[in-house]
């Protein structure tokens, strides 16, 4: 088991005390991070005791302990997965060479951009969600929100460590800039579009955890294949934490769907709004929105940047080492959806420039498995309704579909039809106002808002009625 040294000012398992220059630089950044957390972290709950898990090891088994912590006292630190003896670069032009412990000079700029972009997403989601605690549907959900928030703070530390340790002054300056950008700010926005969207309510939050955090899973898994070993080890541990965030999203939506179905059965109506529920068509519209903006996070379908990341050994495919090919792809092709007049066709493209689309395909297949579990809840209640993922061309702002109008079922349509039917497919102002009207805090242990069912079980073996956050 790889233990973490909590006697240090910055908890870590990288022997930080052996590099005084690096230690001083990170200790200089620490109060700036804490100032950002106080300013932009969860609003109104900084002094409350929250039942949180804290990493005590980087092993997959028994890696965390649970206990009450005030969020500003959470021990954020630098945790890398254990090194793999004899690890090699597993793809690209450097396949078979020993994995790099230092940044290759010729790839310095490219790798820095990758780390900057990934690191920018972590604080952005905290900023997007900072007001949600005031409208929590239960203490159970409030605790899960705060767990996600503090665990978005820790990968931020990991990316800052990589920048400062391996990129010198540039890395230090970028770490400062990271705390100056703000989600949705007109002057200093976050880098990626989805992280500038508002998260004003808990339906949006659960959709964000399911769709947008799942993009994070696939990006981290691709970076975990990197030939740059410190980045690989960082991302491998981050994936351990990411699983809970996806669980929060999937089970959150499932519980909203379950409650809608219960109200439909109880009152023999599809209109559950009059009974304080969120109707299934509204859930579908929110699903369409969050899925489409998350699909944009994978980038353009055809991308020379993605090809360069791969050939240089910096960013692989999802589960790269499990794939049965030459791991260089120079003669390989891959099917990509493209516009062809008024239709959409599949065309063979060089596999190297199609890597964004391949990762998007892996992501969509994973999303579909979660949606199938939601539909199973609907079927068990005997209700004739099915939630569906929209076509990948729907409501896109990046890539080949950015200039097109595509319906959720994959038809290329006119602007007039889009304008006429947009309210069927995406949340309307009335939808948003209704969902917002439901957002009232429920803080009695074991009680839940009218629009969401209780979970199947509590956290870490605790009962559902456990005081997950002490508000007194």
How would you name each of these model-derived features?
Residues 118-121, 202-216:
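Aromatic-rich carbohydrate-recognition surfaces in CAZymes
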Residues 132-187, 238-256:
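Long, hydrophobic, well-ordered secondary-structure blocks that form the structural core
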Residues 1-140, 165-199, 291-472:
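Terminal targeting/low-complexity segments that flank the catalytic cores of oxidoreductases
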């Amino acid at each position: 088991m790889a233990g973490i040294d909590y006697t240090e000012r910055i908890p870590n398992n990288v022997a930080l005390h052996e590099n005084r220059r690096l230690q001083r630089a990170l200790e200089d950044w620490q109060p700036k991070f804490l100032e950002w957390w106080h300013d932009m972290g969860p609003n109104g709950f900084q002094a409350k005791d929250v039942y949180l898990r804290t990493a005590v090891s980087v092993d997959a088994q028994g890696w965390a302990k649970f206990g009450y912590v005030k969020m500003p006292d959470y021990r954020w630190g630098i945790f890398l997965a254990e090194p793999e003896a004899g690890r090699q670069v597993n793809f690209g032009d450097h396949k078979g060479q020993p994995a790099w412990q230092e940044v290759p000079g010729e790839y310095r700029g490219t790798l820095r951009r990758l780390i900057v972009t990934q690191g920018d997403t972590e604080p952005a989601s905290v900023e997007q969600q900072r007001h949600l605690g005031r409208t929590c549907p239960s203490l159970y959900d409030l605790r899960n929100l705060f767990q996600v928030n503090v665990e978005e703070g820790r990968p931020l530390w990991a990316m800052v460590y990589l920048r400062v340790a391996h990129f010198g002054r540039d890395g230090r300056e970028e770490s400062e800039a990271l705390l100056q950008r703000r989600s949705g700010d007109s002057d200093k926005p976050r880098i990626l579009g989805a992280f500038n969207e508002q998260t004003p309510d808990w339906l949006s939050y659960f959709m964000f955890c399911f769709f947008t955090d799942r993009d994070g899973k696939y990006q981290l898994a691709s970076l975990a294949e990197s030939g740059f070993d410190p980045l690989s080890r960082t991302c491998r541990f981050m994936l351990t934490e990411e699983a809970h965030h996806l669980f929060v999203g999937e089970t959150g939506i499932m519980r909203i769907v379950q409650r809608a179905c219960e109200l439909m059965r109880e009152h023999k109506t599809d209109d559950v709004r009059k009974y304080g529920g969120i109707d299934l068509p509204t859930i579908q519209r929110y699903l369409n929105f969050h899925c489409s903006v998350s699909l944009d996070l994978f980038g353009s379908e055809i991308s020379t940047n993605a090809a360069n990341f791969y050939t240089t050994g910096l960013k692989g495919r999802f589960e790269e080492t499990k794939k049965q090919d030459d791991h260089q792809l120079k003669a390989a092709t891959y099917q990509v959806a493209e516009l062809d007049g008024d239709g959409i066709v599949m065309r063979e493209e060089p596999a190297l420039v199609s890597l964004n689309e391949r990762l998007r395909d892996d992501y969509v297949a994973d999303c579909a498995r979660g949606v199938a579990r939601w539909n199973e809840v609907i079927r068990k209640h005997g209700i004739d309704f099915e939630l569906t993922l929209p076509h990948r061309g729907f409501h896109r702002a990046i890539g080949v579909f950015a200039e097109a109008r595509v319906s959720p079922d994959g038809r290329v349509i006119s602007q007039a039809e889009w304008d006429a039917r947009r309210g069927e497919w995406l949340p309307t102002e009335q939808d948003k106002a209704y969902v917002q009207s439901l957002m009232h805090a429920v803080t009695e242990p074991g009680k839940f808002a009218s629009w969401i069912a209780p979970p199947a079980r509590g956290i870490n073996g605790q009962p559902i009625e456990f005081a997950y956050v002490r508000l007194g």
